[in-house]
């Protein structure tokens, strides 16, 4: 399974939920979303800065994208960015193979 890093923001609607229940545990909601599609949530952290939360999960890209779609469609979250962990060495190895055969336009 791939590892995904997901960052996002709460909307005004999401923040209104916190005002109604300041002790709400959103990590449980994130866990429920991951469980619904067979993904594994590894951690949930609230943030100060450009993003309001950070989730680390394992699964497929389709599972991560489904979580994004459903949670943003709820109206409580927005701006979810999904980043997939990669091996930069594997990427570089592929780039070397491509560079040996690729020809730029006009060459």
Regions found by a protein language model. Name each.
Residues 1-107:
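A compositional/biophysical signature of low hydrophobicity enriched in polar/charged and small residues
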């Amino acid at each position: 399974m791939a590892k995904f890093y997901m960052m996002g923001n709460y909307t005004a609607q999401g923040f209104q939920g916190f005002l109604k229940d300041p002790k709400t545990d959103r990590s449980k909601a994130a866990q429920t979303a991951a469980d619904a599609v067979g993904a594994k949530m590894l951690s949930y952290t609230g943030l100060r800065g450009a993003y309001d939360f950070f989730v680390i999960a394992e699964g497929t890209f389709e599972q991560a994208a489904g979580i994004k779609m459903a949670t943003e469609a709820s109206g409580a979250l927005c701006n979810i960015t999904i980043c997939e962990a990669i091996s930069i060495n594997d990427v570089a190895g592929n780039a070397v193979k491509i560079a040996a055969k690729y020809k730029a336009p006009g060459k």
